[in-house]
Amino acid sequence: MGLAGTKTKQRFGLDPRNTAWSNDTSRFGHLQLEKFGWKPGMGLGMSPTSSHKTHIKVSIKDDNLGLGAKIKRTERKDEFDNGECAGLDVFQRILGRLNGKQEEISKELDIQRKQKIIDGKWGIHFVRGDVLASTWDPETKKLKSYSNDKKRSRDDDDEKLSSKNKSKKQKKDKKDKKDKKDKKDKKDKKDKKDKTEKKEKKEKKEKKEKKEKKDKKDKKDKKDKIDKKDKKDKKSLKNNIEVSTTASNIPSTVSTRLSVRSRWIKQKRAATMDSKALNEIFMVTNT
């Protein structure tokens, strides 16, 4: 294409080969294996020298196929290969005809053919999962049992101890709950008592303050009344003194044409100021 062609850029990350995690020697698994005697380059298992030394690869399953289905498909020669020997059913029919069991064999082969068709469309084949070689006995075809009497007795003792510890723990928990409940009840009672005492003290204090306020108010009212009465008496006495002084300050002779009128006013004022003259005017006798 040359320089005029479309340019495509390709970016590489910091770890394009994804080897940073495998080269990291500070991981927990790496350190733990080294504690058990493993060294880099060794394999795992009973014979580390001949075991698998590369990293375990995990592939994501994105289909509904069973285990080993993809491997089986890769082993097929073509798309028509179903993994069985071609012409085997025909050979079995010939053998059946020679042995005089043609009907039985043909019937069985028809049943097998129909069963394959049904299983191929709607059937499910279950594959038995393998177990560890150390736990499987091929002769008896059973799992090996390594339990013995000592282990059983030890397990029984452990169960007894665990049950005892459990019962002790339950008793302790019950006791702790009871103690906590008692403490809480005591605290609630004490708080209630303190509240009632505080309330009573507050009420007594309020009553006392009200009484003191009332007493102060009464004293103040009495004092105000006495002060008012004293002021009133002083004022009336002062007015009497002023009137008497004004009456005494009136000139004896008035050299005007209204001298007769002024004399009459003077006599009238003097008569009103004199209690004895007033008694004579109103004809009141002192007994």
Swiss-Prot record:
What the entry lists under Pfam families is as follows:
G-patch
Alphabetical keyword list: Nucleus, Ribosome biogenesis, rRNA processing
Q: Where is this region: Disordered?
A: 143-254
* PROSITE patterns found in the cross-reference section: G_PATCH
For molecular function, the Gene Ontology terms on record are: nucleic acid binding
The primary location reported for this protein is nucleus
Question: What sequence ranges are listed for the domain G-patch?
Answer: 25-72
Single Gene Ontology BP annotation: rRNA processing
Q: Give start-end ranges for the coiled-coil region(s).
A: none
Q: Where is the composition biased (Basic residues)?
A: 163-190, 201-220
- Which residues lie in Basic and acidic residues bias regions? 143-155, 191-200, 221-230
One Gene Ontology term, aspect cellular component: nucleolus
> Where does this one sit in the cell?
Nucleus, Nucleolus
Q: List all Polar residues biased stretches.
A: 239-251
The family note in this entry says:
Belongs to the PINX1 family.
Q: What does this protein do?
A: Involved in rRNA-processing at A0, A1 and A2 sites and negatively regulates telomerase.
**PANTHER family (UniProt xref):** G PATCH DOMAIN CONTAINING PROTEIN (PTHR23149), PROTEIN PXR1 (PTHR23149:SF31)
What is the protein's name according to its record?
Protein PXR1
